[in-house]
Design a protein with these regions (language model features):
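Conserved blade-register residue in beta-propeller folds
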Residues: 66, 214-216
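Nucleotide/phosphate-binding catalytic cleft detector across ATP-hydrolyzing
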Residues: 2-204, 221-236, 248, 256-353
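Ser/Thr-glycine-rich phosphate-binding loops at phosphate-binding pockets of nucleotides
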Residues: 207-213
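Acidic, metal/cofactor-coordinating or nucleic-acid-engaging core segments within structured domains
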Residues: 242-248
């Protein structure tokens, strides 16, 4: 717990855990204000020749998100060049199709090389947006709230296992030098630039593909001792939908159809299938609130802030007081938050070298 509190303190607080409204908070919102123009600060100026580009990456179980893009968390490896080359990454003599074969949930993201390969793909996408093929990069990433203390050092080592990487993605050659990495708490990072809105008692709920992370933020201060992680992400909702469709109709529906209904509330399918999917998603949304109540959520006493890719489920199928619940359905919000925290840390240190 100490490491987690220290991480929060380094990101947001100064001096005995007290919030510095005159310096850190102001500096933070200067960074955030510049971001409101639609792109990150380092996207606009790339700093200079000595400072690396900060790239925030949200390593989700369902999707990899950066500040500007999102793609499926899936890797299919080949020893020989595959027939279909869409989203093909070539690294150290092997071929990887990015976005293929949905990756199963694992609590330790460092058990294989998949997330490293996905990191390279994410970096390539961000560099492509900047029209760069060679760069020094500082990674800003994160882990679930209750895992960050124990895993952040090993995850940082995992991401920085090589000083540099030469690879090709979608037919373009890239050379990347890794200048460093910062690991922040998931969920919290998505709202770090909005802490001044968290007056009174607040509950933050980050719904991802594999996990649901819950955190209390009271009077603009995150409470390290009131953080919870549950294996109740959108993947559990998808599994429940599949099981219900098989039980009712004996059919297996393509995942893209299910995702469209969950994300948008509807799809071009018959009404009976649509109703079955909606009913199951509604039950899942009720399950989210049930679990929140187990962590003492009371809508009359606190506000609820929902972030993450699964926030669309509550938005489309949940029953709640819209005056007491704020839903941020920007799937890239956490990755943007990682960059903000890393930029703030850089400014405090006078620059990353």
């Amino acid at each position: 717990m100490y490491h987690f509190e220290t991480l929060i303190a380094k990101s947001i607080f100064r001096g005995g855990g007290q919030f510095d409204h005159h310096q850190n908070h102001y500096q933070y919102f200067c960074i955030a204000a510049k971001r409101q123009k639609g792109i990150s600060m380092n996207f606009m100026n790339n700093y200079n020749n000595t400072n690396p580009i900060i790239i925030g990456i949200d390593h989700g179980y369902g999707n990899i998100k950066t500040a500007h893009c999102c793609f499926k968390t899936g890797v299919a490896a080949y020893d020989k060049e595959p027939t279909f080359k869409s989203n093909l990454l070539v690294y150290e003599g092997r071929y990887y199709l990015i976005g293929e074969e949905h990756k199963e949930f694992i609590s330790d993201k460092m058990t294989d090389s998949d997330y490293y390969i996905l990191t390279l793909a994410a970096v390539a996408r961000e560099l492509n947006i900047r029209k760069l093929t060679s760069a020094r990069v500082h990674l800003a990433a994160g882990l679930p709230l209750t895992w960050v203390s124990e895993q952040k050092d090993s995850f940082k080592e995992y991401l920085l296992q090589n000083d540099s990487a030469d690879f090709a993605f979608k037919g373009v050659d890239y050379h990347v030098e890794f200048a460093g990495a910062d690991i922040f708490p998931q969920g919290f990072s998505a709202v770090a630039d909005k802490l001044r809105e968290f007056k009174g008692t607040n509950m933050l709920c980050d719904i991802g593909n594999g996990t649901m992370n819950v955190m209390y933020i009271n009077e603009c201060r995150p409470l390290a001792k009131k953080c919870f992680t549950e294996k109740y992400g959108t993947n559990q909702c998808m599994l429940a939908v599949r099981e219900n469709l098989m039980k009712q109709f004996g059919v297996s529906v393509d995942e893209t159809v299910l995702e469209r209904v969950i994300r948008h509330g509807t799809a071009d399918i018959s009404q009976r299938y649509l109703t079955a999917i909606r009913d199951t998603a509604t039950e899942y949304a009720e399950g989210i609130f049930r679990r929140l109540r187990e962590h003492e959520y009371d809508p009359e006493l606190m506000r609820l802030y929902v972030v993450g890719g699964g926030s669309c489920i509550l938005k489309n199928f949940g029953s709640y007081d819209k005056d007491r619940v704020v839903i941020n359905d920007d799937i890239c919000a956490t990755a943007k938050g990682y960059e903000l925290l890393a930029e703030q840390k850089q400014n405090r240190k006078g620059g990353i070298v």
